[in-house]
Amino acid sequence: MSSFTHFNDQGRAKMVDISDKKATVRTAIARSSIVVTKEIYDKISHNEIGKGDVLAVAQIAGIMAAKRTSDIIPMCHPLLLKGVDVSFDWKQSDEQYRLLIEVKVKTEGSTGVEMEALTAASATALTVYDMCKAVDKGMIIGETYLLEKTGGKSGDYTRKS
């Protein structure tokens, strides 16, 4: 495990200087999920949620969150993102409906986009909750995690199952 780089000589927080790092293509894929009732699943599927098209709004929220990550995560560098893709997949078991959220982020720069992907996945799930809470507040946001990252000095990473 490498040492922490976000502390100065006095032990105080600092933003890491990345000016000497080589600009490379960097990608990250993050996942999250939200479990909803059959009623919410049906309303989302038939576009019957009063606030609008849940998946379209959540997708836009995820993209916006990726772009604004450095505004809410203190030590993240502002990045020029080259692409953000938010996708959805439903999984059903018994009366449980799980909306799987996957976010892919890409840049060419001196630092990775893991935090942008994770922030986007989280904001996407939170937006689904916000738009559907009038129907049922018992929704459960699942684990949010990094699935994969490429590029940079630390190399590639793929989450083990």
From Swiss-Prot:
Gene Ontology MF, one: cyclic pyranopterin monophosphate synthase activity
Catalyzed reactions: (8S)-3',8-cyclo-7,8-dihydroguanosine 5'-triphosphate = cyclic pyranopterin phosphate + diphosphate
Keyword set includes Lyase: yes
Subunit organization: Homohexamer; trimer of dimers.
Protein name, UniProt field: Cyclic pyranopterin monophosphate synthase
Function as written in the Swiss-Prot or TrEMBL entry: Catalyzes the conversion of (8S)-3',8-cyclo-7,8-dihydroguanosine 5'-triphosphate to cyclic pyranopterin monophosphate (cPMP).
Annotated organism of origin: Bacillus thuringiensis subsp. konkukian (strain 97-27)
Gene Ontology annotations of biological process type: Mo-molybdopterin cofactor biosynthetic process
Record Gene3D superfamilies: Molybdopterin cofactor biosynthesis C (MoaC) domain
